[in-house]
A protein has these predicted regions:
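Amphipathic, charged alpha-helical segments and their helix-to-coil junctions
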Residues: 35-38, 42, 116-164
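Bacterial N-terminal signal peptides that target proteins for export
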Residues: 1-8
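Amphipathic alpha-helical segments
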Residues: 29, 36-37, 50-132
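Sec-dependent signal peptide cleavage junction
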Residues: 19-41
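Short, linear, compositionally biased motifs with a strong N-terminal bias
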Residues: 10-13
Length: 164
């Protein structure tokens, strides 16, 4: 139940990010970045709480898990930054009218590169997690991450218009 509530909050936040990408009139790097950072901080705190409540970690497991979790989130944030840059580029191109073929191809390749990096990152963290958690808890954590990511991607996909 707690995971469902968190996913609803996450979905709301995911819908807000593309609207920041389409903000016009504000000087680059001002209000829109501040708003995105506020959303990120809220999401980070909520996500950590949900993970904590759904992992049932022993004290020894928690001692090993949280540093790996924090490193994973830092790396995930770097990927999110790349994706947000791609979304902003798409919003700029979309707002100008029909997106040129070369621009569409470039943006598509950037988005696919982020997906490739995300999978590579997930694979690189499994052995790190296996050093501090039993296999079932590693699988559970990766399921939680995957479910959250799927909801975010679904909401982003629903809020970003198709190329024309």
């Amino acid at each position: 139940m707690k995971l469902v509530k968190f996913i609803l909050v996450l979905a709301t936040l995911a819908l807000a990010v593309p609207s920041f990408a389409q903000t016009k009139g504000a000087p680059k790097g001002t209000a829109d970045q501040a708003d995105v950072q506020i959303l990120r901080d809220k999401l980070k705190a909520d996500k950590k709480l949900v993970v904590s409540q759904n992992m049932s970690l022993t004290d020894a497991e928690a001692k090993g898990f949280w540093p790996v979790y924090d490193a994973y989130q830092k790396d995930l944030q770097a990927l999110n930054d790349k994706l947000l840059t791609t979304i902003k580029s798409y919003a700029d191109a979309y707002n100008k009218g029909a997106v040129a073929d070369d621009v569409a191809k470039k943006l598509m390749n950037e988005a696919l590169a982020v997906e490739d990096e995300e999978l590579k990152m997930k694979r690189s963290y499994v052995p790190k997690l296996e050093k501090v958690l039993p296999g079932a808890k590693v699988a559970r954590y990766m399921q939680i991450e995957s479910k959250i990511r799927a909801i975010v991607k679904m909401e982003l996909a629903a809020s970003i218009p198709l190329v024309y």
